[in-house]
Amino acid sequence: VLSPADKSNVKAAWGKVGSHAGDYGAEALERMFLSFPTTKTYFPHFDLSHGSAQVKGHGKKVADALTNAVAHVDDMPNALSALSDLHAHKLRVDPVNFKLLSHCLLVTLAAHHPAEFTPAVHASLDKFLASVSTVLTSKYR
């Protein structure tokens, strides 16, 4: 459960991401594909090379979903319901992949915002991304 301090940290950190959200989403995906090659199996139709338009496009989708989750941090299950359905019933993404992408997103944010990425912000973002992952996998059962 996210505390009021966690919610404040997440909103402040994501606010600093701003117009770079799509780029950071794409960078996190690239990190995931390079660090965890098995994740590529969910994207057989994508050009997974560095800077590809498809990875950038999906990175923007990831970032937009996270922006939506931040905006609705007190009601993520409703805000992410359609996305949860998509990943559980159509795409059938292994839930472990959400953890891998979350890790890569944390690394990306830390690399771009080292001064703001304090231990408290890191912990809050980690809890937030875990909450998003829980919501996205809630319909797998």
Swiss-Prot record:
It comes from the Eukaryota. It comes from Mico argentatus (Silvery marmoset). O2 binds at H58. The modification N6-acetyllysine is found at K16. Gene3D superfamilies: Globins. This is Hemoglobin subunit alpha. The gene is HBA. The modification Phosphotyrosine is found at Y24. Heterotetramer of two alpha chains and two beta chains. InterPro entries: Globin (IPR000971), Globin-like_sf (IPR009050), Globin/Proto (IPR012292), Hemoglobin_a-typ (IPR002338), Hemoglobin_oxygen_transport (IPR050056), Hemoglobin_pi (IPR002339). Belongs to the globin family. The modification Phosphoserine is found at S3, S35, S49, S102, S124, S131, S138. GO terms for molecular function: haptoglobin binding; heme binding; iron ion binding; organic acid binding; oxygen binding; oxygen carrier activity; peroxidase activity. Heme b binds at H87. Involved in oxygen transport from the lung to the various peripheral tissues.
